[in-house]
Curated annotation (Swiss-Prot):
NAD(+) binds at residues 70-75, 104-108, 128-129, 141, 150, 168-171. Catalyzes the conversion of 3-deoxy-D-arabino-heptulosonate 7-phosphate (DAHP) to dehydroquinate (DHQ). This is 3-dehydroquinate synthase. GO terms for molecular function: 3-dehydroquinate synthase activity; metal ion binding; nucleotide binding. It comes from Shewanella baltica (strain OS185).
Length: 358
């Protein structure tokens, strides 16, 4: 079992990565003793793992569950209220703990519910998708979507522990695994050139779910994320680099309707647009763009935006992006494999040229 620490003073917490961790009551025990436990999961994950985690936690306290519909389109205030209703109807107090058992949608909603309920109760992340294991479960970003923008209503709120059981990936559909690889590749582009090279050399090994390769890839992503979050918890500086591909990607998700494009698929296409923007500005050359495209394609990810999206449909969403400051769109762009920076002087005419030529 691999352990990584997110260092945030009194809000520090461990990430555990390995196999069969959902049956490891000893690791969970210190976070559950004398607490009432409410597991939040969805209709896809519940038949696979809910009984197992309930049995693991039953010796520590009363365990109940809330099962939500599965999909990004349900990550909204209405379904968040389902969690609050369950907590209130069953008289959960401040000594309770919420457990997020699922992917990024479940993790984001459960974390936000924990941040809000009685002004804050404990929560535990047990991510079951590759995307949530390498990205959304770590760092304390919690939120729900709004029809006018993704993740626009939320809070920074850290979990007590992140428990990553890599065996969950064996029940993950191939499309979901590919979507998670978009975030894995992002870390190589924006932070670690050697890791990017390792990914290029291990495509087949990862796609066949080799246990050692999965633990290494997930661990490296979590190490990078933990390092970045420890430096900049609330995204005032370096943490913004983790948004590589996300400004374009969130525009795709919002325009196409949440759930039609998976988050990772939109990030993949958005990462290519970010690379093409960087090339248009003279920050990188064509060879780097090609390496990025080839690696994304190797994992069966989209490398272009939907044909139905034009510049106008992109820009209306990008102007509402959370990173906008003083009315200026701020983009994370690669400056090399393994390096990225935030740019706020990219003109809309440059963006139009890139989007029209993509």
């Amino acid at each position: 079992m691999k352990q990584i620490q997110v260092n945030l003073g009194v809000r520090s917490y461990p990430i555990y990565i390995g196999q069969n961790l959902m049956s490891d009551g000893e690791t969970l025990s210190r976070y559950l003793l004398k607490k009432r436990i409410l597991i939040v999961t969805n209709e896809t994950v519940a038949p696979l793992y809910l009984k197992q985690i309930q049995e693991t936690m039953a010796s520590f306290g009363e365990v109940e569950s809330v099962i939500l519909p599965d999909g990004e389109q349900f990550k909204d205030l209405a379904h968040l209220d389902t969690i609050f209703t369950a907590l209130l109807q069953q008289n959960y107090g401040r000594d309770s703990v919420l457990v997020a058992l699922g992917g990024g949608v479940i993790g984001d909603m459960t974390g936000f519910a924990a941040a809000c309920y009685q002004r804050g109760i404990d929560f535990i992340q047990i991510p079951t998708t590759l995307l949530s294991q390498v990205d959304s479960s770590v760092g304390g970003k919690t939120a729900v979507n709004h029809p006018l923008g993704k993740n626009m209503i939320g809070a920074f709120y850290q979990p007590q522990i992140v428990l990553i059981d890599t065996l969950c990936l064996h029940t993950l559909p191939a499309r979901e695994f590919a979507a998670g690889m978009a975030e894995v590749i992002k870390y190589g582009i924006m932070w670690d050139a050697d890791f990017f090279q390792w990914l290029e050399d291990n495509v087949t090994t990862l796609k066949t779910l080799d246990a050692q390769a999965l633990v290494y890839a997930i661990s490296r992503c979590c190490e990078i994320k933990a390092d970045v979050v420890s430096q900049d918890e609330t995204e005032q500086g370096v943490r913004a680099l983790l948004n590589l591909g996300h400004t374009f990607g969130h525009a795709i998700e919002a325009e196409m309707g949440y759930g039609n494009w998976l988050h990772g698929e939109a990030v993949s296409a958005g990462t290519v647009l970010a690379a093409q923007t960087a090339k248009a500005l003279g920050l990188i050359d064509e060879s780097i763009v090609c390496r990025i495209i080839q690696l994304l394609q190797a994992f069966d990810l989209p490398v272009s935006a939907p044909e139905s999206m034009d510049f106008d449909s992109f820009i209306q969403h990008m102007r509402r992006d959370k990173k906008v400051l003083g009315g200026q769109i701020r983009l994370v762009l690669p400056t090399a494999i393994g390096r990225a920076d935030v740019f706020s002087q990219v003109t809309e005419s440059t963006l139009e040229q890139v989007i029209r030529c993509a």
